[in-house]
Amino acid sequence: MTVTYVIPGAEVTGLERFWEVIGEAVNGPDGYFGRNLDAFADCLSGGYGTPDDRDFVIEWREAALSRRALGHEETARQLRLRLARVPEVNRARVEGELAEAEAGRGRTVFDWLTEIIDERAPGALRLR
């Protein structure tokens, strides 16, 4: 039987809040389902609350609200945080991504998350 995890998009006000919302959707109050992009990808691969047969969907309600909250402004904020700890070898790339986000261009946090879901759980994402 397909399990449906619901993300209430109006509650997603930034990336940190997304981690809380997805954790609760999958694993209940105070649940964990990643606290960074790599951990989120790992959780989607199984063993962290999703069914072993991988028969689940993620229904992201009010996705347009989340898309705005996780847009270029939030992306720039996250990239500034990343820039503070990025290895020198990756600094120029992150600075370029930050410049794009500050100009309102390029991939957003919302894009990062949906791309990870599509990659790790193909066909599981339902944007509403």
Locations of the language-model features?
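Positively charged, polar, low-complexity stretches
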Residues: M1-R128
